[in-house]
Amino acid sequence: MKRGNKLIGALVAVAVVASACGGTGSGGSTAGTSTATATPTASAVTRPDVIVGSTNFYEQITLGELYSQILEANGYKVTRKFNLGNREIVEPAIESGQIDVDAEYLATLLAFVDKNGTISKPTTDPRATQIGLQKALDPKGLTVLDYAAATDQNGFVVTQATASSKSLKKLSDLAPIGNTLVLGGPPECPQRPFCQLGLKNTYGITFKDFKPLDSGGPLTIAALDGKQIDVGLLFTSDPSIVAKNFVLLDDDKHLQLADNIAPVVRNALLNKDDGTLARLLDSIGAKLTQAELNDMNKQVAVDKADSKAVAAAWLKKQGLIK
């Protein structure tokens, strides 16, 4: 989904489950475990055709290329249906069989498919959120595979100079000095449980001031660059983190809901396969760190590199294709 919609979802729509997400999880530092199993196969095995879809922004297209290329390298015929639109278009497409595979975000997808939280609610623990998401996907004939350490969720960043001068690596480092710092973010941030309010309640951080800006966009980036703010709200996979050498502070007390990246696959496709498809897609998640995702996003969004070439280079670097 587009970044603007994603931030609004994180700050507003998902806020209704905040009371159920009180930092009891293990965070997003380790990859998840799906129920899919892999079976070694001979090269002569006939592979099912696969349609890989994506929403309409660069990160999704790159993830779609990662999935497509690793499958193609292992004998699958892949059709790409990228740039389909937002989740309101893509989710019905995978449920109806117009596409077979797409990259998703655990907490956001769970909040979307189970809007009232009657089956499960997103939490700050990726494994618990994955389990809840699978329960919500079961009636739809879909399976969520292993999640990556990489996320696309709210994050708080500082400049390299600020991080070095104040020894900042994680959000809890802000607590003793928060009253000397200015926070920047969307105007609603002071009242939101995953923004300034959450930083106060979870970390005990009280800032000297708050500067209303935009939803993780150019105003926040410019304010950080121009030293108008000390801490800014961006997405954890924002390409400016690499391009500007910002430091993403670790959410060490797990304030944010677990929006780890994971492939979602139609069961009808998995049932035609021998486990190889799930194993191949899971191998991507096992190596996709936050730094690796952010670097690819920077190459595509800032350097204007081709998503297909960026994905191929990453897969080769990781030893996943030749």
Residue ranges and their predicted role:
Residues 18-35:
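Bacterial lipoprotein signal-peptidase II cleavage site
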Residues 113-123, 130-145, 228, 240-254:
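Ligand-binding "clamshell"
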Residues 47-79, 84, 149-221, 305-309:
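Bilobed "Venus flytrap"/periplasmic-binding protein-like clamshell domains
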Residues 86-87, 97-110, 129-130, 159, ...:
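Beta->alpha turn/N-cap motifs
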Residues 95-104, 178-181, 220-234:
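Alpha-to-beta junction loops
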Residues 123-183, 267, 286-290:
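A conserved helix-loop-strand patch within extracytoplasmic ligand-binding domains
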Residues 141-142, 148-152, 214, 237-284:
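Periplasmic-binding protein-like
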Residues 59, 192, 200, 205, ...:
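An extracytoplasmic/periplasmic, membrane-proximal ligand-sensing/linker region
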